[in-house]
Amino acid sequence: MRQFGALRGGRRGLLGCPAGDRGLGGVPRRPLPKGSTSPTLSIYTKNHFFYIMSFMKELELKYGCNPNQKPARVFMENGDLPITVVNGRPGYINLLDALNGWQLVKELKEATGLPAATSFKHVSPAGAAVGLPLSDTLKKIYFTDNVELTPLACAYARARGADRMSSFGDFISLSDECDEATALLIKKEVSDGVIAPGYSEKALEILKAKKNGNYCVIQIDPNYVPAELERKQVFGVTFEQGHNFLKIDEKSAFSNIVTKNKTLSEDDKRNLIISLIVLKYTQSNSVCFVKDGQAIGIGAGQQSRVHCTRLAGQKADNWWLRQSPQVLGLQFVDGIKRADRDNAIDVYIGEEYMDVLAEGKWKNIFKVKPEVFTREAKAEWIAKNTNVALGSDAFFPFGDNIDRAKKSGVTVIAQPGGSVRDDLVIEAADGYGMVMAFNGIRLFHH
């Protein structure tokens, strides 16, 4: 049988009995997840929740991308699905997020040796991170003050906290067994669901109580490997391609450094690898800023490369501004919800700050009316950010991307190269003393 967090001996053939039969030790089988084609079995022990994954060849869905797109299902042409729905009922987009997010965190864990988490929305990550300890400032802006944090919980707090506006209502992917500390963080956030290779007994109890018992919890077989060929249909036309098994590591990511400055610290290397793995599962065009083991700005799905860089840079700036004394000192009214506080901060540090500072409005949000966070003060604070890594899923065609990256503290870059203006892009990077690698790896994802 299969234990959450580990593989155990036994046979899934035990599930051939009728759904009404009693399982091992006389424990009744759980009701079938809706859409499942076979029964499942759950057993509790002192520390873990045991769950036998069902022979699930397909899963019926309520609808596809939109309510009018019926019928809908996910299925395997050959073999069983590598997932089991433990609780709730995932939707079409939930599963797209879950399966893309799982690949991302699995590869982050393999590349760094650290637990990893990602927060997905509409088939792109809003945040992704590995489990490095949090500073006191990060604990405050991630709402984890005075909370016990495991490495996996740190990874999730970072992934969720980088772009809280975009992560609202996300689908979470975890590289490791979900522990109680991580589940307690998830419990407090607005989220659609989570996928992980396992769950501790306490974590599962916490998650199953979320959303009035409807929170989506998915277990994935960590040893599942997809077929070498993958297919999808568009307008009735079938597309086929080889699965992207490209491994991103130190050798592939930045062995060809083209700038005068060629010095990369171990932190730089890890951050660049993280940025590229994130891009591998982000809708193109995409650019990713990473600092201290977490994505701090992801620009996804833009037709223009420089707009990717601007979008990711703005998100990185907002993440950094949230750590400024002026924002940390904001005094919110008692009982304000997290989402309202996140929105107020986002508006306050932006150009439309009067929307929260105007008379008749600020008293609904703040105990004390804040001073305007001026452009000059924001620029001064942003200039203090440094040691940021930048990855791009395709080449930079112009040096303006480098100029914009510099404004958000970028010091190291990994990109494919291959532009007819590579010499000008290198010249721009050299002008700032940056390290830039041409890795020849395009990471388009659609």
Where are these regions (language model features)?
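C-terminal binding/interaction regions
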Residues: 174-175, 188-217, 224, 385-390, ...
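Gly-rich Lys/Arg/Thr-decorated short loops/hinges at beta-loop-alpha junctions or inter-strand turns
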Residues: 77-89, 162-168, 242-262, 340-362, ...
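Active-site loops and adjacent core secondary-structure elements that bind or stabilize anionic groups
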Residues: 45-250, 268-286
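Long, charged amphipathic helices and adjacent flexible linkers at domain junctions
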Residues: 218-264, 324-336, 342, 368-369
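Flexible, glycine/charged-enriched surface loops at secondary-structure junctions
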Residues: 111-119, 217-220, 284-291, 321-332, ...
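Glycine- and Gly-Pro-enriched alpha-helical subdomains that act as flexible
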Residues: 126-164, 296-395
